[in-house]
A protein has these predicted regions:
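Charged, terminal alpha-helix-loop-beta segments
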Residues: 1-243
Length: 243
């Protein structure tokens, strides 16, 4: 079991008080996923995690593994239980970047080796980079997608923030889960978290769709247009956030 291979991991804390910016952001996010089930359903459900409201979520920071004779420490690990009914559990490693930092192919391949050796279901990367197209990782040379034996899923901090804000509307004022989400949003939008404003609109699909609209040449069902429309929804949610 993947959980038996973890050493030195710490339970994710909602209010991290030490560590580098990446670790603090990871800890706050993972702890919120554990405490606010509708948020974890919205963010992790599309990655294959159980959508059962009764499923439990456990999260850790800085799990350490041995791979190829070396110790490798990742930013996080999460487990979503199966809950009730025909749902599946999900064990995932999490690696994050903040600011202008980007994942490299070598890093991701090293973490994929750990995930495969220790029977994790997938690797989740989070950064300020926005994927250029659905199912395409922003790091060139990385093969990702649900059809892979150990898929690599990428979430932008923009998507995390937009999903948190969208989930916020499900709760009435005074509800504890709402307060937790509000604090996560406040934390991530603070400049010290180094979660940047929307960027990377110059990537492949954005350019192609912009050029197509200028030529009046977009066809019905254009996948690039669909992707750009969804990403723009995220940008709009971000811009609507109180600053």
């Amino acid at each position: 079991m993947a959980t038996e291979q973890i050493s030195d991991g710490k339970r994710a804390r909602l209010i991290p008080t030490e560590g580098r910016a990446e670790l603090r952001a990871t800890s706050a996010l993972l702890a919120t996923l554990e405490l606010v089930r509708p948020f974890s359903i919205a963010l992790l459900g599309p990655l294959g995690a159980s959508k059962s409201k009764r499923a439990t979520v456990k999260t850790y920071t800085e799990p350490t593994f041995r791979s190829n004779g070396r110790k490798r420490r990742l930013d996080g690990w999460l487990e979503v239980g199966s809950g009730s009914g025909p749902h599946r559990s999900l064990n995932a490693l999490v690696e994050t970047k903040v600011g202008k930092n980007k994942h490299t192919v070598e890093q991701i391949n090293n973490y994929l080796t750990v995930a495969r050796e220790d029977d994790f279901d997938c690797l989740i990367t989070i950064s300020n980079e926005v994927a250029p197209a659905p199912g395409v990782h922003p790091t060139k040379g990385v093969e990702s997608g649900a059809d892979s034996k150990t898929p690599v899923y990428h979430l932008s901090w923009l998507r995390v923030l937009a999903t948190a804000r969208e989930t916020l509307s499900e709760f009435d004022q005074g509800v504890l889960e709402r307060k937790i989400l509000e604090e996560l949003i406040y934390f991530l939008e603070n400049k010290t978290a180094q979660v940047l404003s929307p960027q990377n609109m110059s990537r492949t699909d954005w350019n192609a769709v912009r050029a197509g609209t200028q030529r009046d040449g977009l066809r019905r069902g254009n996948k690039g247009a669909t992707f750009v429309a969804k990403e723009w929804d995220l940008v709009a949610l971000f811009l609507k956030s109180p600053r």
